């Protein structure tokens, strides 16, 4: 998800992923106007059709140098963008809002049929308890490196499963982070 590419390069990547047998591709939304991302990702989805599922990472829960910042997307924008992605058949929208806006995330989730994913930047079990209590996500993505290690991840996976939610480990770090996620 980290790389930013032109639509033609993304289409080439998608074709290669299909040839290599991948079932899903995650793309990063990064434009100031998220509807520009909807347009680009819609073109890619139109190209691949049902041959490749596409999910989108909005990167709205990010923090840099240890300092949390408020996401650019508010609830209204997140709902509108979600509905636009719904219309083009995206599998899930990841990190569409600030990860500590529990009420806003819950409202977003109720406002769309699109699967909402997140939690990679939340840390420790008590934060996931709040996310689950508010029913913020369909897909919980704890990052083993960023949020407390193996034991914390196992606990969150069990909590998500108990609530009939999907848990999929997240990683955006080095090879050891990927290995730990498995």
List PLM regions with ranges.
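Intrinsic structural disorder
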Residues: 1, 17-18, 51, 85
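Active-site beta->alpha loop and helix N-cap motifs at the rims of alpha/beta catalytic domains
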Residues: 1-15, 65
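Flexible, glycine/proline-enriched loop segments at strand-loop-helix junctions
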Residues: 1-3, 25-31
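Short alpha-helical segments used as structural interaction elements across diverse proteins
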Residues: 7, 23-25, 42, 106
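Catalytic domains of carbohydrate-active enzymes, especially glycoside hydrolases
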Residues: 13-25
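Catalytic core of soluble alpha/beta enzymes
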Residues: 30-178
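A glycine-rich beta-turn/hairpin centered on an aromatic-Pro dipeptide
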Residues: 181-182
